[in-house]
Design a protein with these regions (language model features):
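DNA-recognition helix of helix-turn-helix
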Residues: 139-163
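Sigma70-family region 2
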Residues: 2, 38-56, 75-76
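Short, aromatic/basic-enriched loop-to-helix "N-cap" motif that marks the start
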Residues: 17, 47-64, 143
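Arg/Lys-rich amphipathic alpha helix in sigma70-family domain 2
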Residues: 49-52, 62-84, 100, 152
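A short, charge-rich alpha-helical start-of-domain segment used by transcription regulators
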Residues: 1-21, 31-34, 45
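Internal acidic/polar
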Residues: 71, 79-108, 131, 170-174
Length: 174
C-alpha cells in the first residue's frame, strides 16, 4: 500500500478516469472495464511500496491493466463461455447514441473493428494523451513499433472512415 491513504486516493483520483476509458476501449464492455480498472488499483495498492520511482505510477497502472486485459483475452480464448439464454442479448444496454455525433460514432465503430495492437496504441495516444515512450513501456514494445502502429492505425482508421462515408453517400442516393 502507498505510504498513506491520501497518496493512494490521490493516485486513484488522478488516474481512474483515463484508466477506465482505456479499459473500456480495449474490452468494449463496461463491466470488464470496471473489473480491469479495479484490479489495476488493487495491485497498485499491494505493490506501490515496491515502486522505485513513484512518478511512474501512471505508466505502471496502464501497463498492469493492459497485461491483465491480454491475460483475460487469452483465458477467454482458451475457455470460451456459452450463453445460457439468448434472451439476454435483448437486455444489453448500449451507449446513448443521441449524445454522440454520427462522425464520432463511426470513428468509435471503426476503432473497435481494428486489430488489437493498433486499437490499444491509438487509444493510449489519442484518448489518454500518452507519449510514445509511455506507450512503449505500457505495451512492452520499442518506440519505433509504437510510431509504426500509430501511422498504420491512423491510415486504417482513415480508410474505414472514408469507406463508411462513401457507403452512406451511396445509401443516400438510393
Amino acid at each position: 500500500m502507498p505510504s498513506d491513504d491520501t497518496e493512494f486516493e490521490a493516485v486513484v483520483t488522478a488516474y481512474y478516469e483515463p484508466l477506465y476509458r482505456f479499459a473500456l476501449g480495449l474490452s468494449r464492455s463496461e463491466a470488464d472495464a470496471a473489473d480491469l480498472t479495479q484490479r489495476a488499483f488493487e495491485r497498485f495498492g499491494e505493490k506501490a511500496g515496491t515502486l522505485r520511482d513513484q512518478s511512474k505510477a501512471k505508466t505502471w497502472l496502464f501497463t498492469t491493466l493492459y497485461r491483465d486485459f491480454l491475460q483475460q483475452k487469452r483465458h477467454d480464448t482458451r475457455f470460451p463461455h456459452a450463453e445460457l439464454d439468448e434472451t439476454f442479448d435483448d437486455k444489453i444496454v448500449e451507449m446513448p447514441r443521441a449524445e454522440i455525433s454520427a462522425d464520432a460514432n463511426a470513428a468509435v465503430t471503426a476503432l473497435h473493428a481494428m486489430g488489437e495492437p493498433f486499437r490499444s496504441t491509438l487509444l493510449l495516444f489519442y484518448m489518454n494523451d500518452h507519449s510514445y515512450k509511455e506507450i512503449a513501456e505500457i505495451l512492452g514494445v520499442p518506440i519505433g513499433t509504437v510510431m509504426s502502429r500509430l501511422a498504420r492505425g491512423k491510415e486504417m482508421l482513415r480508410t474505414k472512415m472514408t469507406d463508411a462515408v462513401n457507403d452512406a453517400d451511396k445509401e443516400a442516393r438510393v
